[in-house]
């Protein structure tokens, strides 16, 4: 029973991150930099967890990482409709889900392999933190959110609804 209560702590943090970061991203009308910041927060949390394995600070690190992981979902999933519409948007979302499912398999496998090699979870957590940093760099350097319908304005969070209404 204690394990269940302890496991709940990072996910409460994640739920708070999901709601609060999504609201912040909508209020700022900004996706890329919110996604980048969430990736950095996740990386910091994973490094803290890796440095403090076996202590309560590891739970704090995992909670920070989960806050960032779940906080990235709102900005991330609002982006595909800004780039594509109709069947192209559906196909891109399906492709993203397929890659995510592969990550759901290979992520735990990778952490387990690193734990077997090093006798510690720290290496696996550092590797996942490195992937979060790579995600942040890709966001900063390569992600350019297009203008909706070439209006010269920055993309709005409700741009997908406008396009759907026009179809």
Enumerate the language-model features and the residues they cover.
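Transmembrane alpha-helical segments of major facilitator superfamily
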Residues: 6-14, 100
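Loop-to-transmembrane helix entry/capping segments in MFS-fold secondary transporters
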Residues: 1, 86-96
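Helix-to-loop junctions at the C-terminal end of transmembrane segments
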Residues: 17-30
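Intrinsic disorder in cytosolic terminal tails and internal cytosolic loops
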Residues: 143-167
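C-terminal transmembrane helical hairpin of 12-TM major facilitator-type secondary transporters
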Residues: 29-79
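Symmetry-related core transmembrane helices of the 12-TM Major Facilitator Superfamily/SLC fold
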Residues: 123-141
């Amino acid at each position: 029973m204690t394990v269940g209560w302890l496991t709940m702590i990072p996910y409460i943090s994640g739920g708070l991150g999901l709601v609060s970061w999504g609201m912040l991203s909508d209020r700022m009308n900004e996706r890329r930099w919110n996604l980048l910041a969430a990736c950095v927060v996740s990386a910091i949390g994973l490094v803290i967890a890796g440095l403090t394995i076996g202590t309560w600070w590891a739970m704090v690190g995992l909670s920070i990482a989960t806050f960032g992981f779940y906080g990235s979902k709102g900005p991330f999933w609002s982006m595909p409709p800004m780039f594509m519409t109709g069947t192209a948007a559906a196909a891109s979302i399906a492709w993203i889900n397929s890659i995510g499912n592969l990550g759901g398999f290979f992520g735990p496998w990778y952490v387990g392999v690193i734990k077997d090699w090093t006798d510690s979870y720290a290496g696996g957590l550092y590797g996942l933190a490195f992937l979060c940093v790579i995600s942040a760099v890709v966001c900063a350097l390569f992600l350019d959110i297009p203008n909706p319908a070439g209006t010269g304005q920055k993309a709005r969070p409700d741009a997908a609804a406008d396009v759907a209404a026009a179809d």
